[in-house]
């Protein structure tokens, strides 16, 4: 339907990855670490889906820029992982705060959720990067399909 070089194909892959990953990981954080009720977390995730759809491709472009800088600094695997964490935390935390404010979370819940998300992102930011790369290969985005196939 779309060529492997298609920007739309790239955007769809990035959107799929962000919606799936953020829905699962953030719901677990909100319920088990932040003390939000299931209903609050579900509301947060439902609000987050359209937000994630809007920010997924810009985040992918932002991440790719940070990855290029990291590759120039060091080709080592730790540099990629560090760049993934940095990209994820610096882009997602402000968005997450806005989502939580929108669904009526209290400041203590927001601080707990965002702080927990930052800590978890130190582990999971790199995991999201690998998941995003996997989704790009799955959707046959040209630079990922050819380079990693």
From Swiss-Prot:
InterPro entries: Ala_export_AlaE
Keyword Cell inner membrane: yes
GO terms assigned for molecular function: L-amino acid efflux transmembrane transporter activity
Single Gene Ontology BP annotation: amino acid export across plasma membrane
Alphabetical list of Pfam families matching this protein: AlaE
HAMAP family: L_Ala_exporter (MF_00914)
Role summary: Exports L-alanine.
Entry similarity comment: Belongs to the AlaE exporter family.
Protein name: L-alanine exporter AlaE
Species this protein is from: Salmonella typhimurium (strain LT2 / SGSC1412 / ATCC 700720)
UniProt lineage: Bacteria, Pseudomonadati, Pseudomonadota, Gammaproteobacteria, Enterobacterales
Gene that this sequence comes from: alaE
């Amino acid at each position: 339907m779309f060529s492997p070089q298609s920007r739309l194909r790239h955007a769809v892959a990035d959107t799929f990855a962000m919606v799936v990953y953020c829905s699962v990981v953030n719901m677990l954080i909100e319920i088990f670490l932040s003390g939000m009720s299931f209903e609050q977390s579900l509301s947060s995730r439902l609000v987050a889906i359209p937000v994630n759809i809007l920010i997924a491709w810009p985040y992918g472009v932002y991440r790719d820029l940070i990855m290029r800088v990291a590759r120039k600094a060091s080709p080592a695997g730790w540099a990629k992982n560090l760049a993934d964490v940095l990209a994820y935390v610096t882009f997602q935390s402000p968005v997450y705060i806005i989502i939580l404010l929108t669904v009526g979370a209290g400041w203590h819940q927001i601080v707990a959720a965002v702080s927990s998300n930052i800590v978890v992102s130190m582990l999971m930011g790199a995991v999201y990067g690998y998941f995003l790369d996997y989704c790009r290969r799955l959707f046959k985005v040209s630079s990922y399909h050819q380079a990693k196939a």
